[in-house]
Amino acid sequence: MMQRCLRLQKPLALRRGLRLAQANSQAVATEAPEAEPLDAFERQYLKERIEISPFQRLFLGAGSSIAALLNPRRHDMIACLGETTGEDALWTILDTMQASEEGQRIMADKPRIHTSTIDFKYLETLPPDTFGAAYVKFLKDNQVTPDSRMAVRFLEDPKLAYLMTRYRECHDLIHTVLDMPTNMLGEVAVKWVEALNTGLPMCYGGAVFGAVRLRPKQRRAYLKHYLPWALENGKRTKPLMPVYWEKRWEQNIHELRSELGITVLNKA
């Protein structure tokens, strides 16, 4: 696990330097290089983005981590922590997206997951063994809504901002495909899978510190069943960010899990 973590977390300065060198090389190769046009999401994000200095980023990261540890229900602090600590991991995720056709389509389309963009009435008509039907059932059983995710504000690059947005909006879809509820045990288990799958520091933090808050009975179940299952799935599962979930509604959920390398925990 440590090797995977180290592999994912390349120094941010080095990554920025490599990208800058590539950009300079491309500029030399063409006399009049044209900037890549911004799409609707990127234009809107740049209007609403809050620019912060490196010191402010460090201060926000430290403050939000303490606040999130003291009160895990402070979703605003958890969101801030993700943005101020996750940039390097997001660059790695962007590379992963660009390495697959499905990921490239996501970055081109930039789909959003809201009640205004998903036809939930249609999903309710799907057979019960489809991914779409399972997603609707998950939302109803756990009384959650896809409209509750906080907007990204502190990332500099709009593409990274979309990836963080995508991660947040797909969180319930990950719960669905993993067959995990939104209780503390389920959240901690999902955070481990997400941490190993994405490399996002906030996921590691949520997994480690979330487990500390488990009650004794929950902790026994966590150590005996949930943690081994989560670590195994996190290491084995294919990258989840490049999955175009909205194109998979009609897919049999068991086939989808098999394709992604996911096994469901037997909670009996």
From Swiss-Prot:
Enzyme Commission (EC) number: 4.1.1.130
Cofactor(s) this protein cannot do without: Zn(2+)
Pathway where it operates: Cofactor biosynthesis; ubiquinone biosynthesis
GO molecular function: 4-hydroxy-3-methoxy-5-polyprenylbenzoate decarboxylase activity
Keywords assigned: Lyase, Membrane, Metal-binding, Mitochondrion, Mitochondrion inner membrane, Ubiquinone biosynthesis, Zinc
InterPro entries to which the protein is assigned, alphabetical: Coq4, Coq4_euk
Binding sites annotated in the UniProt record for Zn(2+): 171-172, 175, 187
Residues spanning the signal sequence: none
Keyword ATP-binding belongs to the record: no
Reactions mediated catalytically: a 4-hydroxy-3-methoxy-5-(all-trans-polyprenyl)benzoate + H(+) = a 2-methoxy-6-(all-trans-polyprenyl)phenol + CO2
One BP annotation, GO: ubiquinone biosynthetic process
Localisation: Mitochondrion inner membrane
GO cellular component: extrinsic component of mitochondrial inner membrane; mitochondrial inner membrane; mitochondrion; ubiquinone biosynthesis complex
One of the Pfam families matching this protein, by short name: Coq4
Keyword Chloroplast: no
Membrane protein topology class: Peripheral membrane protein
Self-association and partners: Component of a multi-subunit COQ enzyme complex.
Miscellaneous comment in the UniProt entry for this protein: This protein may be expected to contain an N-terminal transit peptide but none has been predicted.
Entry similarity comment: Belongs to the COQ4 family.
Function: Lyase that catalyzes the C1-decarboxylation of 4-hydroxy-3-methoxy-5-(all-trans-polyprenyl)benzoic acid into 2-methoxy-6-(all-trans-polyprenyl)phenol during ubiquinone biosynthesis.
Full protein name: Ubiquinone biosynthesis protein COQ4 homolog, mitochondrial
Organism: Drosophila melanogaster (Fruit fly)
